[in-house]
Amino acid sequence: MKVSWRNKIALPALLIGIILMGFSSPVVCEDASTGAMVELNKSDRDALALLGGRVVGKALPAFPIRDTAELMPLREGKWAYRITAGERTGTRQETAISKTKGNHGQDLWHRTIVGDFTEFISLDGKGAINLISEIDLEQNVITRYTPMLPIMFDGMKTGDSSQVETVVKVYALHDPTHLKYKGQLKVTHTYLGAYEITVPAGKYETVLIRSSYVGKVGPAHVVDGGYTFYARGVGIVASVERMHVTAFLFYDKRTKTPKVLIQRGGS
C-alpha cells in the first residue's frame, strides 16, 4: 500500500457536520467477582503469530468488561507502533488522538494514523465507545456507519459475542454529497479472554477482542477478521487487523497490519 506521510488534514465546517451525524444508545455494564483463564485455540494462535513469537504470553483471569473508557482511553496524545509483518515490516506507525472541535457539546474524538486514515469516535459518559465514521487520507473518501459501530462492549463476559449490522456509505472527501459506494456489514465482536502481552513498550495485562466482518460494500465482498489487545490506561498494545473498512475497496484484501506498541501516549 502506498503511503504518503501527511500530518494534518483540514476539514471544513460542513464536512465536520456530516461526519458527526447519527448517534446511538449507550451500552450498560456490570461486574463479577471471578474470572476464567482461557487458552487460545490453534486458529487464533496461528493468526496472532504475525505479531512475533514472544508477544502473546500466558492466559490470565478474564473478568467481564466493565471499563471500556479505560481499555481505550480517549485523551490527547501520540502513540507509536512497529509493524511486524508484510511489506512494511519494521516501519514505525504513529497514532494521534485529539478532541474533535465544533461538536456542539458532545464528547467526540478523532484518532489519526498519520498519513493513512482518521477515525471519528463518540464517548457517551457511561463507557460506551462507538465509531461514527472514518476518512481514508490516501483515497480521499469518507465512510459513514448507520448505526455506529461499537468499538467496545461493556458487560461482555469471556466467550460472549455481540453482533451489529450497519449500513456503510462511502462519500467523496471533497464533495461529501457524492455517494461513491454503499453496502452493509455484519460485525461480530468476541471477547476471547485475558492475556499477558510483551511489546517494546513493556509488559501488559490485556483483554483480547476478536472481530469478524461479513458483507458487501460497493464491488467488494467482505469476509474478514482481526484481533486487538487492550490494556487498561494504555489502549491498544498489539493488534492484527485490517486498519479500516475502505481497505476492502481499494487495497489487497489479504493484507493485514500486525503491530506492537513501542511508545505509549496520553499520559
Model segments located where?
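Intrinsic disorder/low-complexity segments
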Residues: 1, 20-22, 252-256
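Bacterial N-terminal signal peptides that target proteins for export
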Residues: 2-13
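Solvent-exposed, flexible loop/coil residues
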Residues: 5, 155, 208
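Bacterial N-terminal signal peptides
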Residues: 12-22
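Bacterial Sec-dependent signal peptides at the C-terminal "C-region" and cleavage site
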Residues: 21-31
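Acidic, serine/threonine-rich low-complexity disordered tracts
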Residues: 29-123, 171-267
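Contiguous hydrophobic, core-forming segments of folded domains
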Residues: 103-170
